[in-house]
């Protein structure tokens, strides 16, 4: 499953929507909730990012992300 993680680069300032960034990770999980938990853990262990939201991408959403040219899987 591929998850889209919305984050701020630092935890030191209040989040601002205009500064929200995204990354994409692949997670093997039994269900969506376990995948979100695993994605959060993976990102928190490897970065100092302030995670705002984690979203499971549907096939159509993934296809759209690839078409827009912003899709790139992040590996830690």
Swiss-Prot record:
What's its EC? Answer: 2.7.7.6
User: This protein's superkingdom?
Assistant: Bacteria
Provide the catalytic activity annotation: RNA(n) + a ribonucleoside 5'-triphosphate = RNA(n+1) + diphosphate
Q: Name one GO biological process term.
A: DNA-templated transcription
Listed A to Z, the keywords are:
DNA-directed RNA polymerase, Nucleotidyltransferase, Transcription, Transferase
InterPro entries the UniProt entry points to = RpoY
Which molecular-function annotations from GO does this UniProt entry contain?
DNA binding; DNA-directed RNA polymerase activity
- Gene3D superfamilies per the UniProt record, alphabetical: RNAP, epsilon subunit-like
Q: Which family does it belong to?
A: Belongs to the RNA polymerase subunit epsilon family.
> What is this protein's function per UniProt?
A non-essential component of RNA polymerase (RNAP).
What is its quaternary makeup?
Answer: RNAP is composed of a core of 2 alpha, a beta and a beta' subunit. The core is associated with a delta subunit, and at least one of epsilon or omega. When a sigma factor is associated with the core the holoenzyme is formed, which can initiate transcription.
Could you tell me what this protein is called? DNA-directed RNA polymerase subunit epsilon
- State the organism named in the record: Streptococcus agalactiae serotype V (strain ATCC BAA-611 / 2603 V/R)
């Amino acid at each position: 499953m591929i998850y889209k993680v919305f984050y701020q680069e630092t935890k030191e300032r209040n989040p601002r929507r205009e500064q929200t960034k995204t990354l994409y990770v692949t997670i093997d999980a039994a269900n969506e909730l376990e995948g979100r938990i695993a994605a959060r853990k993976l990102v928190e262990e490897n970065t100092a990012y302030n995670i705002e939201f984690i979203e499971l991408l549907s096939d159509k959403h993934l296809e759209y992300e690839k078409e827009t040219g912003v899709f790139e899987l992040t590996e830690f």
